[in-house]
Amino acid sequence: MKVVEVKHPLIRHKVGLMREADISTKRFRELATEVGSLLTYEATSDFETEKVTIEGWNGPVEIDQIKGKKVTVVPILRAGLGMMDGVLEHIPSARISVVGIYRDEETLEPVPYFEKIVSNVEERIALVVDPMLATGGSMIATIDLLKSKGCTSIKALVLVAAPEGIAALEKAHPDIELYTASIDKCLNEQGYILPGLGDAGDKIFGTK
């Protein structure tokens, strides 16, 4: 599995700000969008382009345009919604697929409760977004679902990842790509990432 920890100074700075215990909902939400945008820039760097001639202000001009598969953004509810706008800044025409999964706080296992996947997902590149890759259960379950519907081009974008989650994801789906703003130290006994960001969903939605 291709794992990319994006170490750009802007990303490192912004993720650092997100770790503050008393960060406001507004600020956390803004930073999640900004880092999501920067991760999208990196994750799409291998998209193929083709030459197209258009009519410019002074006559015909040859330009580069993205070619190949179109994109579907797949936020994992609910926290993934906090990164979605950052992706759409760069790919505003992307279709949106939604997967609802929550983690059982006792077993740490993923529990699916909703899905709405675009009908032609097998023809698209799926960018799955979720702020935290902890145990990896929710991400694995989402990718299982996408593959069951024929999607073969999948990239996962997360703000913070634990080594345990990366290992689990690689074991389950070695053919996907993972882009993260930070690979953190470990999981604690409750399955939370250390040092992590806290509960990203609560911080994005103001329910902490």
Swiss-Prot record:
Family named by the database record: Belongs to the UPRTase family.
- Cofactor comment in the record? Binds 1 Mg(2+) ion per subunit. The magnesium is bound as Mg-PRPP.
| Sites where the protein binds uracil | 193, 198-200
User: Which GO molecular function annotation, any one, does this entry have?
Assistant: uracil phosphoribosyltransferase activity
* Stored NCBIfam families: PRK00129.1, upp
Q: Which UniProt keywords apply?
A: Allosteric enzyme, Glycosyltransferase, GTP-binding, Magnesium, Nucleotide-binding, Transferase
Q: What gene does this protein come from?
A: upp
Record text on activity regulation: Allosterically activated by GTP.
Q: By what name is this protein known?
A: Uracil phosphoribosyltransferase
In which residues is 5-phospho-alpha-D-ribose 1-diphosphate bound? Answer: 78, 103, 130-138, 199
- On the tree of life, the source organism's domain of life is Bacteria
Q: In which pathway does it act?
A: Pyrimidine metabolism; UMP biosynthesis via salvage pathway; UMP from uracil: step 1/1
Please name the HAMAP family in this protein's record: Upp_B
- Organism this protein belongs to: Shewanella denitrificans (strain OS217 / ATCC BAA-1090 / DSM 15013)
Q: What is its EC number?
A: 2.4.2.9
Q: Does the keyword Nucleotide-binding apply?
A: yes
User: How would you classify this enzyme at the top EC level?
Assistant: transferase
Name one process (GO BP) from the record: uracil salvage
Recorded hits in InterPro entries, A to Z, give:
PRibTrfase_dom, PRTase-like, Upp_B, UPRTase/APRTase, Ura_phspho_trans
Q: What is the stated purpose of this protein?
A: Catalyzes the conversion of uracil and 5-phospho-alpha-D-ribose 1-diphosphate (PRPP) to UMP and diphosphate.
Name the chemical reaction catalysed here. Answer: UMP + diphosphate = 5-phospho-alpha-D-ribose 1-diphosphate + uracil
- What Pfam family does this protein match (any one)? UPRTase
| Annotated transmembrane regions | none
User: According to its UniProt record, which cofactors does this protein need?
Assistant: Mg(2+)
